[in-house]
């Protein structure tokens, strides 16, 4: 065999696997059907700004081994994710914390905020008269009450899923963290940041010295590619790997409307969520804020924004999020059963495992494999 590993997909799972294989003295060939490497982490430089072409990616972890690993490839900056929600022209800090409650009700102490939330939760509990929540709407109202739900959850969630909250299963929202402190840091993790110079630096570092082929569809000449190696690492759609034998898994996808604007600072923050149903996009990303902090944003006279629209996935579109309803979960279980019987194929990543992944757990999983 020509290679120890054939790796299908050069996203974070594939690239990290290739790096670890090479460190262990193994040979790899990495294929990607896109014209570039990096999967959804790919960035394009526009006017000196690294634009996240497939949506905002913010690295965060409490795992020191993973943090040291990525920083050994490329240095990360101090970016802290602190999104803002825009509801009908009023701004609210996220995640839900004392700043949010002050903006919503004018409360200034944790005791006042707690009382307000408990009062609204009790109203919902009373209306359910002892039965459990039947859908996402009831679940959210039980967790945080009507004001937070109506202004910051309902419209955003309905846009994300393309259906009413009353028609979505309750399990989608198991908990909604409420912080009784003035803290806009979205993540609880010890470490977070963005690679200095963008995510391409991370991917290029992981794939340094590895043979790669872009613009190459594994399924077009499957037998040829499979013949090059004893072991295959597959990071694409698991249902496609098995020829959709049991039917197609469903996804949500995201459409991006990118705009280069002749102003140095469009919204003053990397991420602004638009939480009312009537605004068609879910959020606007202003990319320069991921790597330029404070007044430094004015050193670059232009800015790039991306409006994100969540839509139903159809063939030919990029699959983003798995739809974890009963039908898809049981369908995936059938494919997983086939995958578990494979000796020569490793399935890894969000498409091959049909699950939503943050970046750090993907790296953890690969490091674990090589231990």
Language-model-derived ranges and their functions:
Residues 3-30, 370:
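N-terminal Rossmann-like FAD-binding beta1-loop-alpha1 element of flavoenzymes
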Residues 22-47:
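Glycine-rich FAD pyrophosphate-binding loop
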Residues 24, 219-338:
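Mid-domain catalytic core of redox enzymes
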Residues 318-371:
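C-terminal catalytic lobe of FAD-dependent flavoproteins
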